[in-house]
Swiss-Prot record:
The active site is at E133. This is Peptide deformylase 1. Keywords: Hydrolase, Iron, Metal-binding, Protein biosynthesis. Binds 1 Fe(2+) ion. Signal peptide: none annotated. Its EC number is 3.5.1.88. It catalyses: N-terminal N-formyl-L-methionyl-[peptide] + H2O = N-terminal L-methionyl-[peptide] + formate. Fe cation binds at C90, H132, H136. Its cofactor is Fe(2+). It comes from Bacillus subtilis (strain 168). Removes the formyl group from the N-terminal Met of newly synthesized proteins. Requires at least a dipeptide for an efficient rate of reaction. N-terminal L-methionine is a prerequisite for activity but the enzyme has broad specificity at other positions. PANTHER family: PEPTIDE DEFORMYLASE.
Amino acid sequence: MAVKKVVTHPAEVLETPAETVTVFDKKLKKLLDDMYDTMLEMDGVGLAAPQIGILKRAAVVEIGDDRGRIDLVNPEILEKSGEQTGIEGCLSFPNVYGDVTRADYVKVRAFNRQGKPFILEARGFLARAVQHEMDHLDGVLFTSKISKYYTEDELADMEG
């Protein structure tokens, strides 16, 4: 496992749709492990392959709940409902934070690292994290969805 350099905006790779993963091999497993290590090192809750310069439809998410680490390969949203607005940040946009409105519930079909399909149903913060990472796979920047920006001082004031 290795910590990789996170690509920061502006970078073309962040705005380019990623390619479908077709081979589930040791290289993919290493990519997912490197992404996970990088996410933890950077104190994130999710990371998509394009954020480390790899245009593959792969992401990892871990929000600190009992589900633990979730590898998402070739994810697609099957259903979504409800609405939530909350503050988001992104490892590819250091010190940029803002309100983003997303679905409160998503049902996602994806593949695990072995190529086995699974269904993930997520609500609240996990749904937010999954949608954020899936946007990266489509070349969509979270800044295109921000309705209100916050400074670090404003965030610190909110946290008390």
